[in-house]
Design a protein with these regions (language model features):
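Hydrophobic beta-strand positions in extracellular immunoglobulin-like domains
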Residues: 5, 44, 48-50
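Structural detector for short beta-strands of small beta-barrel domains
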Residues: 1-10
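Short aromatic-glycine-enriched beta-strand elements
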Residues: 11-16
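A short macromolecule-binding patch
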Residues: 22-30
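Short strand-coil-strand connectors
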Residues: 18-20
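OB-fold/S1-family single-stranded nucleic acid-binding modules
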Residues: 49-64
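Short nucleic-acid-contacting surface segments enriched for D/E, G, S/T with interspersed K/R
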Residues: 32-45
């Protein structure tokens, strides 16, 4: 999938990716390059997977 980083809190390591009107939360450990940081507004590719609470989360996040 493709989308944009809508929000990212570096202190907590939590963010959101928006794609096609849907919003997918993610943790910084899901950023594929291992950097644990990504700027708000960055274009990304990602996959979705069920998270621990059963909602879909962004994983394998890479900048385009």
């Amino acid at each position: 999938m493709t989308g944009r980083v809508r929000a990212f809190d570096e202190r907590r390591g939590l963010g959101e990716v928006e794609s096609g009107g849907e919003v997918y939360p993610f943790h910084c450990t899901r950023i594929a390059d291992g950097s644990r940081s990504i700027p708000v507004g960055a274009a990304v590719t990602f996959e979705v997977a069920p998270g621990p609470q059963g909602r879909w989360e962004a994983v394998a996040i890479s900048r385009v």
